[in-house]
Amino acid sequence: MKKGMDSDPKIKIQYASKYASTSNYWKYFIGQSKGLKRMKVYNKKVKLENLFRTWMDSTENRKSKYGNVLENIKNAYVENSKISANRLFLNEAIFSGAEILYFSYKIHRSISQLPDKKDLEKRSVAIKKIKLEAEKFYKNYNSIIDEELLSAMLEMYYYNVPSNQHAPIFKNIENQLLGFKKLDFDYYAENVFKNSIFSSQEKFMFFLKNPSVTTIESDPAYKTIMSIYNKYVLDISVKRKNIRQTLQKENRLFIAGIQEMLPKEKFYPNANSTMRVTYGNVGGYQPGNAVHYDYYTT
């Protein structure tokens, strides 16, 4: 993305917001990692768990009530570690990577909801809305950059997600080896863009003259994203749901135990889905040694 932006002022404008969004996300996690280390969060949690174990083991009643809670939480996280990369790379490399994939996913939904051909007026209005959405999409779209992104993101997914969780689409890529030791993701991406109706505004607008779900479902971009997504839904999402339910149940019990152990301690609630009030002074801040950020950007 950066290489393309540096090569052409037009591309720089097209991708400025996308690049900034990706950069902010990357910096956000760098900041989080630094904060966790600086605040010694892990050490504090270990200390709290050890304190809880000592308190719990002091009576049979507590052991009966809370005896398995920490082990159950640990086991749930161990199981989650086996599938967490799948969801992470599904979101970041597939749904938020090459734009052609998610665009095909959205358009499939829009086309499948089109009014019947018998109702020409309503159908025409719906198609016009899709055209407007497409014009907005292609205004800031460069197929050369997106093709490179598709290749890079598929390769990243392939080598970071366990092979037993790979979607059937990766078997197609493996079958392209032709004697080479390294998989050719560039070749696969090139063929997707060569044959997809979503790789250019001209091809997509031609498709809208006679849109059909069947055409989309045979499109290589749509087949790529759905192969990976369906594999996740069938094999991973159910496991993840069970793990989350276990963690929710065990964490609730653990917090109840902590509150019982420290009755005078004040505990703050989970802020998600709550109303919040922000107050204070507008100003810059110092996130690290000799680093100062103003409250505005230029």
Where do the protein language model's features map onto the residues?
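Terminal presequence/propeptide segments associated with secretion/organelle targeting
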Residues: M1-T298
